[in-house]
A protein has these predicted regions:
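Enzyme catalytic cores with a strong preference for nitrogen-chemistry domains
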Residues: 1-176
Length: 176
């Protein structure tokens, strides 16, 4: 399977401009025979969107733009798009209202949504303020292959490399 990594420069809050970048990258990748294209974390809304995430209209606009993008992307290529997703359990379980997510778009539809599991809260990062962590391994099936999805920090909890773990769970181990 041919996979492409879209090197994009999303602008925080520019949903239309960011969607255009994703679409153009997917069109080019599709012409080159790519089956799966990856985009950066929160590529649709830009990273870090910070308090824009507290505006319900902005979050709704992200969902709308994601659906529009799904219909515009070439159908020959699957695309993992960095986005946010509403947490349906936020009020009933006292959880955060959003997930930092990757949406799998294939054949004109959002097929699956995957949630970031490890949320950084050190240095300039404050993801725990806005997001609920995912609670399960993220995998999907494409072209007869099982593919695992991690989002940024999910990769960085390797005690073999760092000499210690920063988080209790290791999403990479859960994929194995």
């Amino acid at each position: 399977m041919k996979i492409a990594i879209a090197q994009l420069n999303p602008t925080i809050g520019d949903l239309s401009g960011n969607a255009k970048q994703i679409l153009e990258a997917a069109q080019k990748a599709s012409q080159e025979g790519v089956r799966l294209m990856l985009t950066p974390e929160l590529s649709l809304c830009g990273y870090p969107p910070r308090d824009l995430l507290l505006k319900p209209d902005f979050v709704a606009a992200i969902a709308t733009k994601l659906e529009e993008l799904a219909q515009q992307l070439p159908t020959e290529i699957a695309v993992l798009v960095g986005t946010v997703e509403l947490n349906p359990y936020a009020t009933s379980k006292g959880q955060k209202s959003l997930f930092n997510s990757m949406a799998l778009i294939d054949e004109g539809k959002v097929r699956q949504i995957f949630y970031k599991r490890l949320l950084p809260t050190y240095d300039v990062f404050d993801e725990d303020r806005y997001f609920e962590p995912g609670d399960r391994a993220n995998t999907f099936w494409l072209s007869s292959l099982t593919i695992g999805v991690t989002i940024c920090e999910d990769l960085w909890n390797d005690d073999g490399f760092w000499g210690k773990r920063s988080y209790e769970i290791n999403p990479i181990e859960d994929l194995a």
